[in-house]
From Swiss-Prot:
<comment type="function">
    <text>Component of the cytochrome c oxidase, the last enzyme in the mitochondrial electron transport chain which drives oxidative phosphorylation. The respiratory chain contains 3 multisubunit complexes succinate dehydrogenase (complex II, CII), ubiquinol-cytochrome c oxidoreductase (cytochrome b-c1 complex, complex III, CIII) and cytochrome c oxidase (complex IV, CIV), that cooperate to transfer electrons derived from NADH and succinate to molecular oxygen, creating an electrochemical gradient over the inner membrane that drives transmembrane transport and the ATP synthase.</text>
</comment>
<keyword id="KW-0496">Mitochondrion</keyword>
<keyword id="KW-0999">Mitochondrion inner membrane</keyword>
<comment type="similarity">
    <text>Belongs to the cytochrome c oxidase VIIa family.</text>
</comment>
<comment type="subunit">
    <text>Component of the cytochrome c oxidase (complex IV, CIV), a multisubunit enzyme composed of 14 subunits. The complex is composed of a catalytic core of 3 subunits MT-CO1, MT-CO2 and MT-CO3, encoded in the mitochondrial DNA, and 11 supernumerary subunits COX4I, COX5A, COX5B, COX6A, COX6B, COX6C, COX7A, COX7B, COX7C, COX8 and NDUFA4, which are encoded in the nuclear genome.</text>
</comment>
<keyword id="KW-0812">Transmembrane</keyword>
<dbReference type="GO" id="GO:0016491">
    <property type="term" value="F:oxidoreductase activity"/>
</dbReference>
<keyword id="KW-0472">Membrane</keyword>
<comment type="pathway">
    <text>Energy metabolism; oxidative phosphorylation.</text>
</comment>
<dbReference type="GO" id="GO:0006119">
    <property type="term" value="P:oxidative phosphorylation"/>
</dbReference>
<protein>
    <recommendedName>
        <fullName>Cytochrome c oxidase subunit 7A-heart, mitochondrial</fullName>
    </recommendedName>
</protein>
<keyword id="KW-1133">Transmembrane helix</keyword>
<dbReference type="GO" id="GO:0005743">
    <property type="term" value="C:mitochondrial inner membrane"/>
</dbReference>
<keyword id="KW-0560">Oxidoreductase</keyword>
């Protein structure tokens, strides 16, 4: 779960 402005679904 990462809150990164960009949209990284890893």
């Amino acid at each position: 779960k990462n809150k990164v402005p960009x949209x990284q679904k890893l």
